[in-house]
Amino acid sequence: MKLNVCFRICNFLFQFSLEFFSISSLHSISSLHSISLSLSLFFLVAILYNIYIYLFRSKKKPKRILFAIPPLCPLCSPCFFFGTSSMLL
């Protein structure tokens, strides 16, 4: 149930970021940058939610936050870093 709510929130943020960046891409940001920024926002929300679940909702508390991050997708880090680096361009 809670994962379904999280999926809906992430989907809403993903759609909102796509709309926002597609509007702003008409002015200054290229479409490739807008897609990477929206993907980075989507994966950032998913990673933060997983940290919240593993730190506050799991019965067994992790000793370090590094081990609390589950592997979501092998492309998470490149998408996030590509999105943040494209903001600087």
Swiss-Prot record:
Bilayer-crossing regions: 9-29, 35-55, 65-85
Alphabetical UniProt keywords: Membrane, Transmembrane, Transmembrane helix
Domain of life of the native organism: Eukaryota
Localisation: Membrane
Cellular compartments per GO CC: membrane
Lipid bilayer topology: Multi-pass membrane protein
Protein's name in the database: Putative uncharacterized transmembrane protein PB15E9.06
Source organism (scientific name): Schizosaccharomyces pombe (strain 972 / ATCC 24843) (Fission yeast)
